[in-house]
């Protein structure tokens, strides 16, 4: 998957975890850069502040699903890998996680 500057990034997460959990955290990292992914909304709720990681409480995850949108706003001089890491959280501890890498370039 390739991402371009200012392009809307759309993601879908389904939690298939049988144990108890409080919510999920989505962390992102643009490798080789200090820039951030800008979160726009999740499950139809606008995000008004700039956050480096997105926590979604289980209470707002109908059917254990989250849909989100984000963007990357800077113009890269080179290609970057972008890591999306989602963790299932129970009582402030990570119980499971999954990662996805995508390519970011102009």
Predicted regions and their residues:
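C-terminal beta-sandwich interaction modules and adjacent acidic
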Residues: 1-106
């Amino acid at each position: 998957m390739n991402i371009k500057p200012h392009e809307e990034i759309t993601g879908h997460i389904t939690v298939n975890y049988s144990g108890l959990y409080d919510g999920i955290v989505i962390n992102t990292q643009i490798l080789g850069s200090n820039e951030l992914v800008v979160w726009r909304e999740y499950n139809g709720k606008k995000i008004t502040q700039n956050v480096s990681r997105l926590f979604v409480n289980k209470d707002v995850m109908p059917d254990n699903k989250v849909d989100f949108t984000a963007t990357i706003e800077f113009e890269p001089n080179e290609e970057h890998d972008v890591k999306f890491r989602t963790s299932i959280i129970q009582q402030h501890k990570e119980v499971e996680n999954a990662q996805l890498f995508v390519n970011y370039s102009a």
